[in-house]
Amino acid sequence: MNKTAISIIVFFIGQILNAQTLEKMNWFNEPSSWEITDGKLKMSVTPKTDYWRISHYGFTVDDAPFYYAEYGGEFEAKLKISGDYKVRFDQAGMMIRLDHENYIKTGIEYVDGKYNLSTVVTHQTSDWSVIALDRPVDAIWIKAVRRLDAIEIFYSFDDKEYVMMRNAWMKANHPVKIGMFAACPDGDGFDVTFSDFTVTHLPDKVRTGWLEQNAE
């Protein structure tokens, strides 16, 4: 068997495993319409939903669709997002969630006719940071790396070159729910597709450091 044939087989095995992984995940606030095909999650986002706590606006909401799996330890997570954003605050991306008072949501958000790279970090109250884009984009990749008590967040337009957009605190040594979210605070919903979702375990830095210092 030549290398090309082996590469094709490995690719399709990866696609199958990815699809099986998506099938085993869980919903929080399941939307009325969604499907998983060919390793992609497609959903119609529930209208008038969001994730936010208290600050600036004075309200707390925790009712948008979130499709997740639970992971402990340190990891690198990545996904691709493509959405048909329509009105102000339409958003989609990755969420890393400890509980209803502690979470990070990051991805793309449509505000006043412009696309923004958006991150909301919530610990009791929410903050919001954005990077405005100078043009619409068909898709974006988000990557999150959890190390110790921090999560580094990166974006890419081609899944090759990644740029850091945020470094945020998250309590160490606690399992988190991680996956795909979308919200539509103002509108009547929109369609979004998630693909290439992966979570890769990373060896714990403290433990590996101890092993190195105490090698036989």
What residues fall within each predicted segment?
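Bacterial Sec-dependent N-terminal signal peptides
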Residues: 1-21
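Extracellular glycan-recognition regions
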Residues: 20-216
